[in-house]
Amino acid sequence: MTTRLLLLADTHVPKRARDLPAAVWSEVERADVVLHAGDWVDERLLDALGSRSRRLVAVWGNNDHGALRERLPEVARVQIEGVRFAVVHETGAAAGRERRCAERFSDVDVLVFGHSHIPWDTTAPSGLRLLNPGSPTDRRRQPHCTYLTVVAHEGRLGDVTLHRLAR
């Protein structure tokens, strides 16, 4: 079986946008699993995404407080199609990230993270794949708002695609 995943982080709704872009909601409808790496800001988006997703795996971020921290873990771990994922918001500075994350998440194949709003796709020497989808609502110093789609099949990742949203 093939499983289609949507990777999101740093949505900051309603602070950075009133809602997720229509293209992201379309991806939610197509995805088998949505992974969200935190910074929701408002619990209403968690409820909306939870009700519209087939399956949601999510964590809280540094801008999430109160009910969001009560409802979500700091780190989530899930196995999908034989691929072991961890989801976390904060991984620290870019310098040394692969080494730090490979040590902290030695039991997973893929780490999905957020916080920087900067898309990231690297593989640590240990084999750990690190993916940051950027932000679909707040591009910061990036030219575009972004998100990732990924396909998991028979223990492997494929079709890792960074989607750039029009301003």
Give the location of each predicted region.
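Helix-adjacent hinge/juxtasegments
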Residues: 55-96
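Pre-active-site segment of Zn-dependent metallo-hydrolases
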Residues: 11, 15-25, 87-105
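Active-site environment of divalent metal-dependent phosphoester hydrolases
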Residues: 12-16, 40-45, 63-69, 92-98, ...
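Active-site neighborhood of phospho(di)ester-bond hydrolases with catalytic His/Asp-centered motifs
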Residues: 7-9, 33-39, 57-62, 87-89, ...
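Short, structured coil segments at secondary-structure junctions
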Residues: 52-53, 126
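Residue-level detector of beta-strand structural context in well-folded domains
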Residues: 75-76, 119, 148
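Binuclear metal-dependent phosphoesterase catalytic core
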Residues: 2, 8, 80-81, 103-107, ...
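N-terminal active-site segment of His-dependent metallophosphoesterases
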Residues: 1-51, 64-73, 82, 143-145
